[in-house]
From Swiss-Prot:
<dbReference type="InterPro" id="IPR038358">
    <property type="entry name" value="VPS28_N_sf"/>
</dbReference>
<keyword id="KW-0967">Endosome</keyword>
<keyword id="KW-1003">Cell membrane</keyword>
<feature type="domain" description="VPS28 C-terminal">
    <location>
        <begin position="124"/>
        <end position="220"/>
    </location>
</feature>
<dbReference type="GO" id="GO:0005886">
    <property type="term" value="C:plasma membrane"/>
</dbReference>
<keyword id="KW-0653">Protein transport</keyword>
<feature type="domain" description="VPS28 N-terminal">
    <location>
        <begin position="13"/>
        <end position="120"/>
    </location>
</feature>
<dbReference type="Pfam" id="PF03997">
    <property type="entry name" value="VPS28"/>
</dbReference>
<dbReference type="GO" id="GO:0000813">
    <property type="term" value="C:ESCRT I complex"/>
</dbReference>
<dbReference type="GO" id="GO:0043328">
    <property type="term" value="P:protein transport to vacuole involved in ubiquitin-dependent protein catabolic process via the multivesicular body sorting pathway"/>
</dbReference>
<protein>
    <recommendedName>
        <fullName>Vacuolar protein sorting-associated protein 28 homolog</fullName>
    </recommendedName>
</protein>
<keyword id="KW-0472">Membrane</keyword>
<dbReference type="InterPro" id="IPR007143">
    <property type="entry name" value="Vps28"/>
</dbReference>
<dbReference type="GO" id="GO:0005737">
    <property type="term" value="C:cytoplasm"/>
</dbReference>
<comment type="similarity">
    <text>Belongs to the VPS28 family.</text>
</comment>
<dbReference type="InterPro" id="IPR017899">
    <property type="entry name" value="VPS28_C"/>
</dbReference>
<keyword id="KW-0813">Transport</keyword>
Amino acid sequence: MFHGIPATPGMGAPGNKPELYEEVKLYKNAREREKYDNMAELFAVVKTMQALEKAYIKDCVTPNEYTAACSRLLVQYKAAFRQVQGSEISSIDEFCRKFRLDCPLAMERIKEDRPITIKDDKGNLNRCIADVVSLFITVMDKLRLEIRAMDEIQPDLRELMETMHRMSHLPPDFEGRQTVSQWLQTLSGMSASDELDDSQVRQMLFDLESAYNAFNRFLHA
């Protein structure tokens, strides 16, 4: 019945147009790819923070778990935004408008720069939890960035130890305290300009990561 009727262009086999099978790239070079990767990371952090806020409101996470998770996300947000901030993106509000990111709860946390569980007094348990999480991440990030001089590591490590001491809920034999104490002893035997060698950095990262995981297990117990 339809014999002899030619196929309408665009209505038939896409095999006649090999360009339809070509990968569409958002970037033209490595620099552009890194830019989009950085924006995607920031987008993901904000969305995750929004989800965490909703979970806390619905009592799906405990206050301690929420405080630790939110504190980590705030640290990650600051690092991610620094990678994106520039002539195209000057503020997080501008980023959210540009990419239609509707996360009001996350934006409130970002602007207050602290979990909702934290009050202003330094003795508050949630304040201590947030500080411990932030200090663990800060020290580990410094080591990963090859910042390894004694006078650049010891102050944060000492503050981490002091903050853990203020947490009366932590058991006296908590392994994180012992780990930090041992490294403080190592650093105390060094001069200000001395640097940790590669082996020490690797071991310290392993020890602090283990201590940080132990701290999170304690919060979930």
